[in-house]
Structures are given as structure tokens and as C-alpha cells.
Amino acid sequence: MSGAIGPIIGQNYGAGHFDRVRRAYIDGLIYVLVYVLVVWTILFFIRDMLVDAFSATGEGAELVRLFCAVIAGSFVFVGTLFVSNAAFNTLGYPFISTVFNWGRATLGTVPFVWFGSLWLGVPGVLWGQAAGSILFGAAAAIVGYRLVTHLHRRPPGEPPVPIWRIALSPFSTGKSLTGI
């Protein structure tokens, strides 16, 4: 999904169809929601079959059941993050994409998993991972929605103001690094 939504957003942005950019972003989020709900529903109903298929017992069986019944739903927010990052990258905001990706992978994972494990043991690891994904996915969706609803203020052709400049080595234009 994240590889497919970027070109659609980019083409409509380049053509100045800001309403279509917003619609593509929202449709991408809806697609992620529906897809995860379908898979989550399937996992919910086959969770005991999966436990049997993996010959899981005890705590392992309970973890599989927890994931299939509850935690799998948090992947809506992982997908939301992917769609939002594709939009950020396509619209010229790769730094925002990087912040959200790095944030979820570090700040949205390590402390949540650590505290989750302290409070709930092994299931807390899954709960912590889900909590971090929900936090960063929801934040990315909010920022992404605000971005696509305010595109008309910055027409195509005007690149966003860079947050920093990459130091260029001698004999280099830096185009391979920045794409500019």
C-alpha cells in the first residue's frame, strides 16, 4: 500500500488536484482499516487452530490467542503510519516521515515494551508494542491529514523549506542524496 499510494498522491499533487490528494490519502487509510479488520477477524476466528498448528501450550498459546484476538487490531495504526509516511515523502516532507518511522521504532517501542513487560510480563511486550504503534500511527494520521488538507496553501513547484542542508563533498551536486 505504501508503495502504491505515493504515485497517486504525487500525480494529483503535481496536477494541482488537491481535493484528489486528500481523497487518495483518506482512501488509503480506509483501505488499511478494512484490510486489517478483515485479517483481524480471520485471525480471531482461527486463533485456536493456529495454537494447534504451532503446537503452542501454556503461555505461548495464550500469547497467540492474545495476538489474534486483540493485538492484531493495532496494525491499523502501523498501516496508517505507512500510508502517512508515503504521503510525507511524496509531498516533499521526508524529515517528518523519518521522525515518525524512527520514533515508532525507538520511542514508540522500547519504553512501551519495557514498561509493559515490567507490569504484565510477556503479554506486556505485545501490549507495549501495540500501544507505541497506536500512538505514532494516530499522530502520523493527524499530521498527514492536516498536511493534505492545507496543500492549496503551497502550490506544486514550491518545495518545502528544508529543515537543514546536507553538507556536500567537493565535486558533488548532492542530487543523489537529496533528489533536488
Regions found by a protein language model. Give the residues of each.
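Short membrane-interface helical motifs at transmembrane helix boundaries
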Residues: 38-61, 65
